[in-house]
């Protein structure tokens, strides 16, 4: 084969001209010290706050403290895999997670990796964990109801789509139970084909026991609620940085639905454990402690998370993200640091009491201390008309009950008020995993506020309610359907319902 010098020189010239002079520069630092999930790194001069870094062992971390001579990195994993002198590389990326409908029905960790053994998640989109909350102009007032299926909530402390309603109470008072019941109650609305009415659910477990998370997942699966839910978990055995990060990651998953003309409901269980994880990280990073040893920006920790829950304007697609943060109190002390912070950020609170719980009043909602700052704007017309008087009657009952302990001779009107109050309190009791459809709640509360249960023994109120609803389903299903479809309670519906309840009163014994 003949070799031509001209061809060789041409090839060499082309190679020289096409040679890329831009060498890839990757900034590398070294670990000075490591311990308690924190690594001090030297040499990452251009690293940005919140940037992901990778250690030579493959473990990831996040740069949180940028100091003059070193960088404080929190480790997303075991610090046993990171040693002094190890190399650390910048990734140039902020923490992001997979988002989209592909996550529905799955259990993932704080970084969006599946932990349910059902294979990889092929999400088409990713989104940063920390996103800016929507401004004032893209928002709209809350005006649609989130039907929780819990009578005491839907009637007295209504939650609207886009609202932030705090669930607060001591341990073992049924905080998580309220959230799970709200998830289960979305089954009917999610079985339809209209995506703008559906409400997707996200449960965020922060610092919970693994057995507790497994139990919640099993309950959601048994009730058929897992298919429209995502469970995001950073359990008690996981490092503090992941417990700190998990609410933000889960919120990004919820924001996908909010920004795509859909609706999502997110439960943070619970934010006191996130604050404890953040306090641990801050103290180890040598940040100055404040009240109760929490860092100075612990308010901002929760406010920047909860502000991301919003009802978007029609121009922005009219989607919404509703947040139900949970806070655990110690011995009912709502004036502690974290509870007061979160109460001031949210649009109302559901206050659960141990005493009520042990008296058998479940859900153990203290109606006097619980409030929704959105109020009746988040209720349907039917519920507004029926539940308007119940809150006042219960408030009067509690006031009178306190006085009645001291006096035995009470006049007839006071006696009537006390009797009605006892029966209404009984009517608002509800077993767990039995959320009630909206139209049945309306009928039940109408019977309660219009004297149909006044002549019934307190112990028979629940039996009356079950029998009455069963009668309504079998004989007056059209009436229930009208309330459900119109969401209103017209005079015609009222007269029909009154006649039906009068009829039932004759046959109930």
UniProtKB/Swiss-Prot annotation:
Keyword Ion transport recorded: yes
Family annotation (CDD domains): ATP-synt_F1_alpha_C, ATP-synt_F1_alpha_N, F1-ATPase_alpha_CD
Keyword Membrane: yes
InterPro entries: ATP_synth_asu-like_sf (IPR023366), ATP_synth_asu_C (IPR000793), ATP_synth_asu_C_sf (IPR038376), ATP_synth_F1_a_nt-bd_dom (IPR033732), ATP_synth_F1_asu (IPR005294), ATPase_a/bsu_AS (IPR020003), ATPase_F1/V1/A1_a/bsu_N (IPR004100), ATPase_F1/V1/A1_a/bsu_N_sf (IPR036121)
UniProt keyword annotations, A-Z: ATP synthesis, ATP-binding, Cell inner membrane, Cell membrane, CF(1), Hydrogen ion transport, Ion transport, Membrane, Nucleotide-binding, Translocase, Transport
Major site of localization recorded for this protein: membrane
Entry's Gene Ontology molecular function annotations: ADP binding; ATP binding; proton-transporting ATP synthase activity, rotational mechanism
Subunit structure: F-type ATPases have 2 components, CF(1) - the catalytic core - and CF(0) - the membrane proton channel. CF(1) has five subunits: alpha(3), beta(3), gamma(1), delta(1), epsilon(1). CF(0) has three main subunits: a(1), b(2) and c(9-12). The alpha and beta chains form an alternating ring which encloses part of the gamma chain. CF(1) is attached to CF(0) by a central stalk formed by the gamma and epsilon chains, while a peripheral stalk is formed by the delta and b chains.
Protein name in UniProt: ATP synthase subunit alpha
This protein's encoding gene: atpA
